[in-house]
């Protein structure tokens, strides 16, 4: 365990974390179809995203599925691989069960441990043993101490390429009846006082509300985030999952320009 005076720097698929660059993860919540993920990969790569995100395996709050929902699972992983190769963009996707690790590791550059599995220590341990970089999302009811403890389960396996991702906490008041979480930007500097690991912020899941994505993304840069994860979809209102939170390509392009303009103020780049 390194001193907190030290900040880890490492590269994943040629992209540096922990330095001046603030890498951007972008893509749909769910890999809905081959055509959709190829369209997204093409556009976000052209706009400047560093990683393609998309879930082939999706944990939902309720087991009920809308007519639009189709968990693509093995096919989704295959389509992510096709998009990765065609548009030369690295991939992050969630792993929910240990048995799917070999298949997912063939495609993913980063394994995402979702918030609901933040304290699934056997899963974290198994994922860490693959030596693939991990992103561990903070559970919406967990303390900073719990979150860092989850990361330690990966670190003790000798896997030092660990990203931590803040994606909102559950509080009594979230400013909108449709919002479930509050983005805890205070945790970014707080975590940086206690850990050497890079801190990524996910404003999309935290706000659950498209109009707030811009301001919370800009604020994430201002507070010292080491990466930003954004939900981007070609037709947000018809997204199969969480249609209130994705932004479209035009909005993403505009936001990327705004992020690039303010990053130098805090000594960073996009």
Regions found by a protein language model. Name each.
Residues 1-25, 266-270:
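N-terminal amphipathic alpha-helix/helix-capping segment at the start of soluble metabolic enzymes
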Residues 12, 17, 130-232:
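Catalytic alpha/beta core domains of metabolic enzymes, predominantly
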Residues 21-39, 62-70, 90-94, 114-115, ...:
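Active-site mouth loops of central-metabolism enzymes
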